[in-house]
Structure formats: structure tokens, C-alpha cells
A protein has these predicted regions:
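Catalytic cores and adjacent flexible loops of soluble metabolic enzymes
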Residues: 1-200
Length: 200
């Protein structure tokens, strides 16, 4: 994979904690991947973050993915923040697994994480669209007042588990219109038409 030029793209894989032994992972410099997202529920947070530290030691950018963020109370989230600060992952992301987050709850979790995490850790949001909040919540995330990098996930046509995710074509248009980005919407729509619509 050494000849694969990623240019400005970060290629990231995902591991559901407990399903992939570390022995199955090559060092990052021998892999096509730049980073790995590790997803886990709160009852596994201690051992999952320890696993994340070992993945990071292999050279990967590690994303600590908090599945079902709405299941965390404040004390549990503070515990997670301490665990994350100890290993300094590339990012910590809120995963709204059932699309339950309303604006107030989203901002509550965001600012708890923003206040507690070390400044070099990016803060992300992975939406699900059960209550049609995915795109709106991504917009709220982008408006949050923070000095750290903010990551918002989206997929072509919003395809994803259950009700799906935030549609990347909408998010890209929003970023172009309000954040001076230059995403090629026609390329996204071409990918949608050529690869996705046949299965919908």
C-alpha cells in the first residue's frame, strides 16, 4: 500500500470493540488505513479505551466512538473524558445510535466534552436520522463555539443503519454556502445516481 497516494484524504476503518483482536492489525505504516474508529457502549468504556491505546501504539489515528451517547449520564461522561485524556486519541465522537438527540441534549454533551477533553483532541458527531434530526444537529455542531477541530459524519443519500445518517449531499452544500468550502456536489450526485439509486 505504500504507493497509494491518499493526498488530502484520511482513510479510516471501523472496529466494533470485542470483534477484532489486535493480532489482526498491521502497523499503520504497513496498512492502507490512516486511522481506526473504535465503537463501544458505555459499559465497555474502560477496556475499550485501553484497546484504543494499543491501536494508537500501532501508529493509527484513533477515534473513540461513544455509541448511544444518550445513555451516558454526566458522571459516566466525566469518567470517559478522563479515560480519553489519558490516551489522547485523535478524536472523541458522540454516536447518536437511535437518533434521539435534540438540540439541547446535543449541546449539553458537546460542551461537557469540549470543556473536559484536552485541546488537541478533535470532537465529532455521528448522527442517525430516526427523528429527522441528523442534518439539523450537524448544523448545530458546526455552530458550536470551540477552538478544537469539529468532525461531522455524513453518507451519500444518508444511507446507513436503520433510519440512516445525515445526507452528505446536503451537508456539503451547507458547508459550501456557509463555510467557504468547495465540495463538488455534482460528483456526489453522480456517485449517488450510479451506485446507490439502483439499490433503493
Amino acid at each position: 500500500y505504500g504507493k497509494c497516494n491518499h493526498k488530502d484524504t484520511m482513510v479510516v476503518g471501523m472496529i466494533d470493540y470485542g470483534t477484532c483482536s489486535l493480532s489482526n492489525l498491521q502497523p499503520c505504516n504497513e496498512s492502507i488505513l490512516d486511522g481506526i474508529r473504535v465503537i463501544f457502549k458505555k459499559d465497555k468504556r474502560k477496556e475499550a479505551v485501553e484497546y484504543c491505546a494499543k491501536v494508537k501504539a500501532l501508529g493509527y489515528k484513533v477515534f473513540v466512538q461513544l455509541v448511544s451517547i444518550t445513555s451516558y449520564n454526566d458522571e459516566e461522561l466525566q469518567d470517559l473524558i478522563k479515560l480519553a485524556n489519558d490516551i489522547e486519541p485523535y478524536a472523541v465522537s458522540m454516536v447518536d445510535a437511535y437518533g434521539l438527540l435534540q438540540k439541547d441534549s446535543l449541546l449539553h454533551y458537546f460542551y461537557m466534552l469540549d470543556e473536559g477533553l484536552k485541546e488537541n483532541i478533535s470532537l465529532g458527531y455521528h448522527s442517525h436520522n430516526n427523528f429527522q434530526r441528523a442534518f439539523a444537529n450537524c448544523q448545530e455542531m458546526l455552530l458550536c463555539n470551540t477552538k478544537r477541530d469539529v468532525l461531522v459524519d455524513a453518507t451519500v443519500y444518508g444511507m446507513g443503519k436503520s433510519a440512516g445518517n445525515c445526507p452528505i449531499e446536503l451537508l456539503a452544500m451547507h458547508l459550501n454556502d456557509y463555510y467557504n468550502k468547495n465540495y463538488d456536489i455534482s460528483q456526489i450526485l453522480e456517485a449517488l445516481n450510479c451506485n446507490i439509486m439502483d439499490i433503493y
